[in-house]
Amino acid sequence: MSPPISPTPPPLQPPFPPTAIARGPDRPDPPPQHQQAAESLVNAAAQHVAPTCPPTSDELPQMEDQATNSSNDSLIPSRQAPNQEETENAITAGTPPDEMEPTKDAQTVRFSSSSPASYSTHEYPTEEINEPRTSSRAPNTASSQMAESSFDFRSSRDIGSIRMGASALVSALNALPWEEDDDSDDGEDDDEFIEPARGSSSTIYERKQRPQTPSTSHGFHPTHTLHFPFRQNAIARRACQPGTTELDYQYATPETSSRRTSAAGSESSSEGEVPLPKGFVSHPNLIVPSGEGEAAAHPDPKLISDRITKEQQIADVEEQAEILRSAEEQEMRLGKEFVPPKSRDSADLNVDAALREGGSEREDVIEEQMQTNEAEKRLTRNEKLAERLMEVFGLEEREEVLEEMKCWLLRSVMLKGYMYLTKRHICFFANMPNENNLLVKSGPLHKKASRSKLNTKFWVVLKNDVLSWYESTSDPYFPKGNISLQYCHSCDAVSGTRFKVRTSERNYTFTADTESSRDEWVKAIQKVMFKTQHEGETIKLIIPLEAIVDVEKSPTLEFTETIEVKCIDAEDQMSVDSYFFASFPDNDYAFSAIQKLVRERPSPPELPRISSVTTIHANQEPLDTSHATIKRHGTDSSAEKLGMASHRPFRKISSVLKPLILKSSDGEPLEEHSQGPHHNDEDASHLPHIEAISNRRRSEEESDNDYFDGYPPRQVGPPPPSMNDDARNWRPSWIRKPASKLFGSSPSGSFVSHPGRLPTDSSTTVTESGPSLRSRTGRTKQASVTEVIEPPIQYEEEVSEDEMSNKPSVVDSNSAETARKRAARLSWTSETSSGSQMVKSKSDFSMLGSESGHSESAETVRKFRTFFALSDKEELIDHFPGYLYRVLPVSGRFFISTNYFCFRSSQLLYKTKESFRLMIIPIRDLYGLKAQKAFRFGHSGLTVVIKGHEEIFIEFRSASRRKACIALLEERMEAVRLSGENTIVDSHKIEARIMEDLDESTPVEPKSPWPVSPSPLFGSTTSTSFLEFKPEPMKITCLTIGSRGDVQPYIALCKGLQAEGHITKIATHGEYKAWVEGHGIAFESVGGDPAELMQMCVDNGMFTVSFLKEGLQKFRGWLDDLLNSSWEACQGSDLLIESPSAMSGIHVAEALRIPYYRAFTMPWTRTRAYPHAFAVPEHGRGGPYNYMTYTMFDQVFWRAISGQVNRWRRNVLGLDATTFDKMEQHKVPFLYNFSPTVVPPPLDWTEWIHVTGYWFLDKADEKQGEKSWTPPQGLVDFIDKAHGEEKKVVYIGFGSIVVSDPEEMTRCVVEAVVNSGVCAILSKGWSDRGSKKGEPKGDSEGADGVKYPPEIFAIDSIDHGWLFPRIDAACHHGGAGTTGASLRAGIPTIIKPFFGDQAFWAERVESLNVGSSIRRLTSHQLASALIKATTDEKQISKARVVGEMIRKENGITRAIEAIYRDLEYAKSIIKSLPSTDDRTPERISSLLHPLTTADLSFNRVRSRSRSRSRSSQGRFSPRRHTVDDDGWSVVSGGSRSRSGSASAVTSPERRPLNIGSALGSHVFKTALLPNTFGKWRNLEEGDDR
């Protein structure tokens, strides 16, 4: 009779109901119930994940008897079974039972525990599930069949390793409720006892606390920590977080008793139903009648079954993947000798882990144990690296990597890569990746014309694989010519400073300024040629330790020691080849490591040698036949003779040069049997016979026709086994490139240019009839050094049909597919090898008028790439005829390709003059397109806006062509932008690292920071231009005078030099001491007051006559103090960097005999491109005027100081007097710290003059140990409020400028701000210095009697680096540092120059159209400039582009590179000390003599009688008869010789100075001197007075 059906299911209760955990007084201390529950759960989980063997027929009866006994016995006979009405919830609340469906070969787990004597301690085996069950209901037939098929549990002896039970354990731990339910109802009957369910292996008892360690009666269970080798599997995750469907299924009320019985043996309860795990059968008396749960909704059984099946499949897949991954990691960690433990089965391990792991903290423990420590990671990585080396270098066996170091291999080209040290080999690996948009080198060179033979100076740029030359650095899109280095044969230095670049069509001759510059260009071009012709290839060097004779340090390079590895030549035992390695992270450590490795190498008998007569047996299966088979091309049935190689999956095409040293299992070298044309079945599995005659001399004796001239290199020794990776299509790779020789003096070790290709012209032969390999001398072959160049892997889809159709046939039909994969690198000699890469043009134009159909298009593409020197990857999309306007319209054709917009003139006149013949603009540089009216009737115009360049105007004959061009260009611009190819390469990255790591996916070592300077692409082994080899740490002194802006760049430079390991010091005015030392830089004080100097410059102008007159009165003593203090400040220096304004540096460096550099913030070197910064006219006057300003200023400046300087040289420095010509200032290396974007380097500057970029000092006002700078209070709110009101914010500040009327200047600025409608941040400092410092500064309300409006926020000082990026425009005085800061922020800049170089920067800003210049400050002009700066979109966008380019520069890095590069040159120009007889002529007066003694210079004559030989007169200067400048004075009216006559040779009156400008006339005419140049005298003539 069925009990009444509950109307609604009760709420869910915890998994353990009170009846399941209650105890009675007669049950004082029962065994733990959870132990048995865990045992059952683990059994259930293990049965579905751990396949086991089924029991034998003999074991089945015994197991049935045990099951019967276990069902009849009772652990506690005195206890009574509970009433049938009492119900109990299932103990599981996690994984549904059907998800834990076991396999047929499952094994149960038993928990053994020490219990009191009153309890039974024997185990109860699991009852066979397929046995008929005793129940109050008749089981459903289908359900019984399902249970019978699903629950066939068997015992097993070996279940596997711990990994096989780990997932089961996780499921059990997550499903088992370890915590005791403290909130259970105590009112329940505590005396009720649940009899053990049938089918379970033990009785469930309650316990208060789960033991943390297993308590077992068996002593063979050791305690261990459980490690989970893989993440929590899917079953455990679903057990922790079951889905809604799973919960509905678990807690659903069963419809029939048969389903409940057959599905899970579940129990019903008024509290709700939870199915028991499989293997648990409820007691017959506890089964609820079938009608109780019919009111509850139950899902469709088919849906449940499908869901369970799907989830089971997902779980199996995930779990299998985790197990395999764990197995692989475990095997790699332990090596091949790893043996799984056999002492314990997985059931015992699962039981121990279940008892030991804490329930509440199990997830944390699992997560913690899953994390591998650093030692394990390192071990795993070493194992992977050893495997990788064995594969890449073709080693015979896996060798432990003892050391891995970055280094350079020094040969005819410098190769950067990695060295790996093993117990048997020294391996070197270098890779040349594909790099685009790489600026390698640029600079001025003279090019010899092909017709006139005249040399013309161009700006030459080596970018990617193209050498181009331009008329100007400011016009980078119109090259005058170019050379594609891909087709160059050679680049060699010739006589003097000339070098030639040779192609198949013609030779090009270039001339550099110096031999060192010539060598750099030659190395750069050679390196790019090598890289281009071997792009994507790898270079490998394998040196067996057996071949090493000695290892020693060699001073090959000046700035670093190289490690020389000497190896015996395998060809000639009397010769030794040397390999030089340099630039290790630690040279001493690398040297000691290599030495130790060589000392501890095995003795020769222990090392396997390559025998000349070697027989290889292939009857052992482990022998990899694919690595020992070489097939001569042209033979038939190559697939058959390759044996297993044809079936071996392709693994790595670039496997290299494995030494032919194959061992048998006992370690002895294997012998190789010949396999002739007729062989039996037993020999069918043997290797084909290999015979390689590697002796060069023998081949010469045997064949007179086989002449070997040393190149291409040939293989020495038997071909390595790895060449069988593709043994059927050997072809010498040097055929495709005429001059791709890697090693200039190639050692006689083996040099294989491509594995898998047999050089047809080498002496290596393959025969099939000889019984054995023959030796050239009969003695054992020594291990030889292997050098390999491997081409990149080419895939089939990368090779076009045209390439295959034009490629010579070098392989048989069986290897055609492999040949297609490599055709791209082998088709160099094909004329149409790149034709298939063309996109069909939309027009029918052919540049040369070809009419050959499809070949016309291919010919067009080929010639397009040739004309513009573009790579084969560049695809021509379309081309249009049109006109390019360069003063006059130039007819030609515009080409649009994948990444470039090009133009080529078609006019004969322009072709002859090579003027505007070519235009090449990267599409990434295009800023916009704008249709416009044409200049001519019937044409359509188009304006092309280029980033950082002037606009280009072009015309088309029809609007349709213009529309098509615009559409295509816009499409390409968008495509380039989306593909990320629009990044601009840093201009300072002039050199590239072409060598990469061994394993691209896993770095060989952590990416430690390399030196700041980029690694060189054109390093010379004899030149310091190889910047990777830095000099030893030096003591560097920076000498400068002037304002704060003159000192700040040197602080930035010194901090960069300190980062390089040098000791730096700044010598400047004493008022900057605290500031300099606050940045951690040593300080030395020099004389002079910058405030007085600045005031004099503002009042009188820079270096005018009035400035000189006032200087005579005030600064004669100042100059003496400056010279003497500079000499003292520079003591102990190894290198001196000076601003030319300090005037003393070149003399101090000569006395100290140290390298000397100059650095300045404005142009100081003669050029026709820009005027002198102190003589900038209001309007441009052309190149002659610009050059004259430098000449004039140099002469006047030297004349002004020469007298005092020469006396100081004699009295303090111990040097003879000098002249302007003998100083040779134009030869001094110069560092200009402004941007090449703002001031492009002129063509007439030499190669030791560098425009490095700005030396920015971020947070200049911060000091070491002080808190960071913070903006003034209210400034941020002011800026945000203005932007919120849509007003522009500008900065106005003129620095510490001394002005005559500060009140008027303040009023002008305020009115301009109000009239322009902007908000201004005003930094009023123009009355804070010099004689004006006593005046009031003003406050935030106003200054100088002018009240500030709300639109002005007044500040005292501000960090420009913080402020400028937050505002819209800046107006300042035009100092070099402030101008650089505003341009760097990318905002329009307004400059009001006051003195010095400020007018120059104002002119540059206006020329670049990134701002305005105000010559005369008025409120109207300033307001107009502010309006234009904040509203002119063209000016704003141009300023933004310039800012982006400046931010990409790194001026400090480039300056340090230039210092390293020119250090050798700077040392070479140090003058030697003269002998006592070589005294220079001297002058007799000084500019700074008092004005009241006009003839004092004559009375101060100090004549010395000197005897000179003719041989000594020309030692220092070719103009030896030029007398010293000490006897001339602008003020005194000159001096005359003691003989009363001027020297006809040296008198300046007879020198044409070409001073015809208004400025020059004004300077010299206002001097009011009877003789502008004064009198010159020759002391040699006056000695005999």
UniProtKB/Swiss-Prot annotation:
Show where the GRAM domain sits: 387-555, 862-933
User: Membrane topology type, per the record?
Assistant: Peripheral membrane protein
GO process annotations (BP): carbohydrate metabolic process; lipid glycosylation; sterol biosynthetic process
Q: Where is the composition biased (Low complexity)?
A: 255-273, 1529-1545
Domain (PH): residue spans on this chain? 438-530
Cite the binding residues for UDP-alpha-D-glucose. Answer: S1043, R1044, D1046, I1358, H1360, H1373, G1377, T1378, D1397, Q1398
Primary role: Sterol glycosyltransferase responsible for the glycosylation of ergosterol to form ergosterol-glucoside.
- PANTHER family linked: STEROL 3-BETA-GLUCOSYLTRANSFERASE
Primary residence: cytoplasm
Q: Which protein family is it in? A: Belongs to the glycosyltransferase 28 family.
Q: List the Gene Ontology MF annotations in alphabetical order.
A: sterol 3-beta-glucosyltransferase activity
Instruction: State the taxonomy lineage.
Output: Eukaryota, Fungi, Dikarya, Basidiomycota, Agaricomycotina
**Name assigned to this protein:** Sterol 3-beta-glucosyltransferase
Where does this protein reside within or beyond the cell? Cytoplasm; Membrane
Record field: catalytic activity: a sterol + UDP-alpha-D-glucose = a sterol 3-beta-D-glucoside + UDP + H(+); ergosterol + UDP-alpha-D-glucose = ergosteryl 3-beta-D-glucoside + UDP + H(+)
Question: Matching Pfam families, A to Z?
Answer: EryCIII-like_C, Glyco_transf_28, GRAM, PH
Residue ranges with Pro residues bias:
1-18
Give the matching Gene3D superfamilies.
Glycogen Phosphorylase B, Pleckstrin-homology domain (PH domain)/Phosphotyrosine-binding domain (PTB)
SMART domains in alphabetical order: GRAM, PH
Biased composition, class Acidic residues, residue ranges: 178-194
| Keyword annotations | Cytoplasm, Glycosyltransferase, Lipid biosynthesis, Lipid metabolism, Membrane, Repeat, Steroid biosynthesis, Steroid metabolism, Sterol biosynthesis, Sterol metabolism, Transferase
Region: Disordered, residue numbers: 1-151, 177-225, 249-279, 625-645, 666-852, 1499-1552
| One term under GO cellular component | membrane
Compositionally biased intervals (Basic and acidic residues): 670-689
Bias-annotated ranges (Polar residues): 65-92, 105-123, 132-148, 760-785, 806-817, 827-840
Give the EC number. Answer: 2.4.1.-, 2.4.1.173
